């Protein structure tokens, strides 16, 4: 089990229900087996440093967790499928 920090950005033009649904979908990936979410924080709507998919703002969500590497692969798969998430990054902490 390794420690990870995950940050993902959602499109700014989706509603609160869609934001909540997307956060729950991502959290469900890690709510099984031995994985543990240490902190999940919705940072809200922020300006982007540059335009991504014609958006200048994005809804940021940050997570700190202990997870198996297979769950990170599953996270990346779900993010690629979900059109509401415009960018994500996974950082493995040492």
Swiss-Prot record:
Keywords: Ribonucleoprotein, Ribosomal protein, RNA-binding, rRNA-binding. GO terms for cellular component: cytoplasm; ribonucleoprotein complex; ribosome. The keyword rRNA-binding applies. GO terms for molecular function: small ribosomal subunit rRNA binding; structural constituent of ribosome. The keyword Transcription does not apply. It holds the Pfam family Ribosomal_S6. Binds together with bS18 to 16S ribosomal RNA. This is Small ribosomal subunit protein bS6. It comes from Phytoplasma mali (strain AT).
């Amino acid at each position: 089990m390794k420690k990870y920090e995950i940050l993902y950005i959602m499109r700014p033009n989706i509603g609160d229900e869609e934001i909540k649904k997307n956060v729950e979908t991502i959290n469900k990936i890690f709510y099984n087996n031995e994985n543990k979410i240490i902190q999940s924080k919705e940072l809200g709507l922020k300006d982007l440093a540059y335009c991504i998919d014609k958006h200048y703002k994005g809804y940021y969500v940050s997570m700190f967790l202990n997870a198996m590497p297979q769950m990170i692969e599953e996270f990346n798969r779900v993010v690629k499928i979900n059109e509401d998430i415009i960018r994500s990054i996974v950082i493995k902490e040492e």
